[in-house]
UniProtKB/Swiss-Prot annotation:
Transmembrane residue ranges: none
Site for Critical for catalysis, residues: H123
Name under which the protein is recorded: GDP-mannose mannosyl hydrolase
pH-activity note: Optimum pH is 9.3.
Enzymatic reactions: GDP-alpha-D-mannose + H2O = D-mannose + GDP + H(+)
Resulting phenotype, D21N: Increases Km for GDP-mannose 9-fold. Reduces activity 400-fold
Family listed: Belongs to the Nudix hydrolase family.
Organism of derivation: Escherichia coli (strain K12)
Assembly information from the UniProt record: Homodimer.
Keywords: Hydrolase, Lipopolysaccharide biosynthesis, Magnesium, Metal-binding
Gene: gmm
Amino acid sequence: MFLRQEDFATVVRSTPLVSLDFIVENSRGEFLLGKRTNRPAQGYWFVPGGRVQKDETLEAAFERLTMAELGLRLPITAGQFYGVWQHFYDDNFSGTDFTTHYVVLGFRFRVSEEELLLPDEQHDDYRWLTSDALLASDNVHANSRAYFLAEKRTGVPGL
């Protein structure tokens, strides 16, 4: 269920959003990051993912989002649950007048790069980086780097 922009703004202003993030690994042990074109985290490299819609099961959201973000429809059983995370942003999808709060369910899985059909709606570029390279880059958003930092994983529910 997609909301009108005004209604969605009320939701984002008032409540946390639920989303899925995908920690996608290739056969070389590199991880997929896309350069975000939209707020929040605009201009940063970020793992693929997206919001769960109202009345959408996690299984359906996983399949919809893997198709939308990777061009490859995968069942939720393809992913290893990677914990419950919290993401806080100073801006929102429409500007800087209120913050955004996400409760994020992480899923990690391996894919064959050749199977992916990466879209350009949410990201204007993609890269595969080793965990060391993405941790060393200030252009990778802190919320994505956290998935690879042992001290950030400590105490994360589900890990």
